[in-house]
């Protein structure tokens, strides 16, 4: 028998308060026995994980430091498709690497994730970029780089960021109570395609079809039907 060798992972993050609150991705720190934060001035701190929310892929860390420089937050709702954005992170351990691209789409829902209206970009994101900030050209953080969509496992021009307002809301709830409370309607919906539109007598596909209603849920109590 051989002793287990500790696995070391890397990711990115950014400071949102002068007293050492840091945002990153949940998958960067989940199940970690020890988290070490290295700042751009090369100081290192052992971090405490204040909370992790896997559904939104957001985690909040705290380091014992004061008077730290903090990012400025922007409004992701003001982003326009085609607008330039910039990511900063440490892909493959190459610290403070900057990549740029454009906003490809807003409000994307991924197949395995229905809790975040992702910002889709073509910014190059690689292992180690996760949890790093996505900036607009005003130098404001508008998103948290989270994941890529790829058939090969490598970057193929599809990267996704959590809108910063979503991430900050999750972060505040994690700091306050260690968990996130979400509302729900209790319905399943699907897109209306051409075939469904014709069956309903619509001239063009539009709207959404209520495909299921959770028994006893808010929508059911309000009288919504399939």
Write out the residue ranges for each language-model feature.
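Serine-dependent protease modules
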Residues: 1-222
């Amino acid at each position: 028998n051989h002793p287990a060798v500790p696995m070391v992972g890397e990711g990115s993050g950014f400071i949102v308060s002068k007293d050492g609150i840091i945002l990153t991705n949940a998958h960067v720190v989940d199940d970690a026995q020890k988290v070490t934060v290295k700042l751009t001035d090369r100081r290192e701190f052992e971090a405490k994980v204040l909370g992790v929310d896997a559904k939104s892929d957001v985690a909040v860390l705290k380091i014992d430091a004061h008077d730290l420089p903090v990012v400025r937050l922007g409004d992701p709702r003001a982003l326009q498709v085609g607008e330039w954005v910039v990511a900063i992170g440490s892909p493959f351990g190459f610290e403070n690497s900057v990549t740029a691209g454009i906003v490809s789409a807003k409000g994307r829902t991924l197949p395995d994730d229905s809790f975040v209206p992702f910002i889709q970009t073509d910014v190059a994101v690689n292992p180690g970029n996760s949890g790093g900030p996505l900036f607009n050209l005003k130098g404001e953080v508008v998103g948290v780089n989270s994941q890529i969509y790829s058939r090969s496992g490598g970057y193929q021009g599809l990267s996704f960021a959590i809108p910063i307002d979503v991430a900050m809301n999750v972060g505040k709830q994690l700091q306050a109570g260690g968990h996130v409370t979400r509302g729900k309607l209790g319905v399943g919906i699907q897109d209306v395609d051409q075939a469904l539109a014709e069956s309903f007598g619509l001239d063009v596909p539009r709207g959404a079809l209520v495909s299921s209603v959770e028994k006893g849920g808010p929508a059911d109590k309000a009288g919504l039907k399939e």
